[in-house]
Amino acid sequence: LQDVVTEYKLRLALESWEKSLEICEPETVVVQLSAPHRGHPLIFNAMAVYRNTTARLMVDLKSVQEALRYHDPYEVAAAMTNARDKVKRSPEMLKVIQACFDCVEVAAVHGIRWVARTSATNWSIEHPLCGLDLMVILTLWLWRVEHDDEAPNAEEIAMYEKLRSLFDDDSVEMYGKLSSMVARVWGSMIDEVVVWGITKLMGESFKLHAQALSGYEEAMLAQEQAHSAPTMTSHNLAVAAY
């Protein structure tokens, strides 16, 4: 937000709302055993909006939201990947990443396939919509931690490992890096939700986004190998001349 006063008021309102949850009197409501939440479903849905609002105050993903209007997964995926520079590494960003962790943890703990097939009965449309921003931010933050020249600090390493612990080692090794794996797993989960039409678009977009992240990594590796090739050739010539 360009208006500092408005941003401050929004942050204050969000903080007050979060604190109020602790003193809310629980309503008498029957919660299904299969539900991914323990309290009232309205609180569960409101938390998705809360996390999304917190993230939007830090990262502007308007380009991704605009791309959704055209229902072209390639355009949406390109907007996702091109938003890399908007996701910074900072102590404030770690708070947003914690919100992203809380979002993906629900799916990881209950099972990706289970959530994909039952979310329509337990979740509202707010969850896939709000999860879009959070997962874009999360995958780009993970990518930066994995590829930035600046080494991650202790807090970033702890967060990275906490996220990695949500998935088995075989899955991470299969997709190479955690950033592309999270994008692919989230895309596969959302793609199976058939109740809302927009989730199909989101799922395909995240899968393409995962390919872009892993493809960029392969391009960087090829570039490094190309730079090292002349050095090796010169070394071999020098040895031969000797």
Where are these regions (language model features)?
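Intrinsically disordered, low-complexity regulatory regions with latent secondary structure
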Residues: 171-242
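Long, amphipathic alpha-helical regulatory blocks in the mid-to-C-terminal portion
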Residues: 1-181
